[in-house]
UniProtKB/Swiss-Prot annotation:
Span list, region Disordered: 430-473
Protein name in UniProt: Phosphatidylserine synthase 1
Residues in the Cytoplasmic compartment per record: 2-35, 94-102, 208-216, 308-319, 377-383
Gene Ontology molecular function, alphabetical: L-serine-phosphatidylcholine phosphatidyltransferase activity; L-serine-phosphatidylethanolamine phosphatidyltransferase activity
Domain of life, per lineage: Eukaryota
This protein's pathway: Phospholipid metabolism; phosphatidylserine biosynthesis
E.C. code: 2.7.8.29
Similarity-based family: Belongs to the phosphatidyl serine synthase family.
GO CC list: endoplasmic reticulum membrane
Record gene name: Ptdss1
Biased segments, Basic residues type: 455-464
Length: 473
């Protein structure tokens, strides 16, 4: 019996590995202030599920076959999300509630299974499914068939420039602001922005709407829309990095206004981590990981345009913008999990959301290739090879610039935004490269300096004035 117990004892490395992986895959909520929202309600959900199924099964009118199928699909999705709340991991985020991120992961699993299902259909069946969802898609036309691109580029007038500031320019701006919040690196954001414009050039022979005038690509897209969004997102990142996170309990707030503000702040991050994608002492594996990150990012963007071109629906259709919003939701935990896997030596496997996101990206590409064989038969392999080499070159150029900046202007001291309801520890280093020897300016783990520094920080937090749930000095 003793030998059996001893064989189950985990080593220190196993404990550290499980702790690091849990922080990105099963983040826990500490210092819970309202127990009701975090207490398990499995019996309640079971009773609700059984009663609701009995009600809809015996009371609704089932005379219309199409309504039966549609409502059956919605019910399957709804109850699958309930199972997601009960069984799936929280992921790296806990705000506004872990149940929300469990449902996001559940939706990503459903979308993954839907893509697998599409692979076993033919093109006519897929189109029939689309027409069943929206009969108006029978009359949809490709944008490339009714519009001209890159025409009279030498004619540059103020009226023509202003006409390009449409809803898509607005989407570019806010889209890049959100991307900057996720990536949190000027170098990588600008590299992805420039690389995407080059991607459009290399795939212009397949998608005519990628053709743009030079001033549209350089000035309007890269500098104004993308650049403005990157700047706004990074300003918000710097603001969140500089804040001191010390969340107060609802019980400690005695004013109605304070409780309302604290409830609103529940939808803000519990903490904010300064990221460092590349370190001068990082190994080649870190460089290859960032290159893979950029390839998957570009592939996900390409899928957006290939899907609507092959299956013929407008960019304004819900099939297009709902997919974009959905991909944006699952990208947030994916980037956090991939960054931890790439930079933390103790995290030796990717998170589940990151794994599912990668599969979704490649499955979408496979779906496009299967149902767009006529389109991809025109592919020029030389352009694809040049595109891969171009992405590799820009990646290495970006990383070299980041290393040069770090060596000449010094390393920025890493800051930890702590929160009382998180399990984040300042003793855990997030920016050691995989296979790297470690950075000299990073403090050793479990040192007295770290303990005293953490103690001083907790003392400082305990003395801070609590206002609307956030401690301010």
């Amino acid at each position: 019996m003793a030998s059996c117990v001893g064989s189950r004892t985990l080593s220190k490395d196993d404990v550290n590995y499980r702790m690091h992986f849990r922080m990105i895959n099963e983040q826990q909520v500490e210092d819970i202030t309202i127990d009701f929202f975090y207490r398990p309600h499995t019996i309640t959900l079971l009773s609700f599920t059984i009663i609701s199924l009995m009600y809809f099964a015996f009371t609704r009118d089932d005379c219309v076959p199409e309504d039966n199928i549609w409502r059956g699909i919605l019910s399957v999705i709804f109850f699958f999300l309930i199972i997601s709340v009960l069984a799936f991991p929280n992921g790296p985020f806990t705000r506004p509630h872990p149940a929300l991120w469990r449902m996001v992961f559940g939706l990503s699993v459903l979308y993954f299974l839907f893509l697998v299902f599409l692979l076993f259909l033919n093109f006519e069946q897929v189109k029939s499914l689309m027409y069943w969802l929206d009969p108006n898609l029978r009359y949809a036309t490709r944008e490339a068939d009714i519009m001209e691109y890159a025409v009279n580029c030498h004619v540059i007038t103020w009226e023509r420039i202003v006409s390009h500031f449409d809803i898509f320019a607005f989407g570019h701006f806010w889209g890049w602001a959100m991307k900057a919040l996720l990536i949190r690196s000027y170098g990588l954001c600008w590299t992805i922005s420039i690389t995407w414009e080059l991607t459009e050039l290399f795939f212009m022979h397949l998608l005519p709407n990628f053709a743009e005038c030079w001033w549209d690509q350089v000035i309007l897209d890269i500098l104004l829309c993308n650049g403005g969004g990157i700047w706004l997102g990074m300003v918000v990142c710097r603001f969140l990095e500089m804040r001191t996170y010390h969340w107060a309990s609802f019980k400690d707030i005695h004013t109605t206004t304070g409780k309302i503000k604290r409830a609103v702040l529940q939808f803000t991050p519990a903490s904010w981590t300064y990221v460092r994608w590349f370190d001068p002492k990082s190994s080649f594996q870190r460089v290859a990981g960032i290159y893979l990150f950029m390839i998957i990012w570009q592939l996900t963007e390409l899928n957006t345009f290939f899907l609507k071109h092959i299956f013929v629906f407008q960019a304004s259709h819900p099939l297009s913008w709902c997919r974009i919003l959905f991909i944006g939701c699952i990208t947030a935990p994916t980037v956090r999990q991939y960054y931890a896997y790439l930079t933390d030596t103790q995290c030796k496997r990717v998170g589940t959301q990151c794994w599912v996101f990668g599969v979704i990206g490649f499955l979408e590409a496979i779906v496009c290739i299967k149902f767009g064989q006529d389109l991809f038969s025109k592919t020029q392999i030389l352009y694809v090879v040049l595109w891969l080499l171009c992405v590799a070159f820009t990646t290495f150029l970006c990383l070299y610039g980041m290393v040069w900046y770090a060596e000449h202007y010094g390393h920025r001291e890493k800051t930890y935004s702590e929160c009382e309801d998180g399990t984040y520890s300042p003793e855990i280093s997030w920016y050691h490269g995989k296979g790297s020897k470690g950075s000299e300016d990073s403090p050793p783990k479990h040192s007295n300096n770290n303990e005293s520094h953490s103690s001083r920080r907790r003392n400082r937090h305990s003395k801070s004035k609590v206002t609307n749930g956030v401690g301010k000095k």
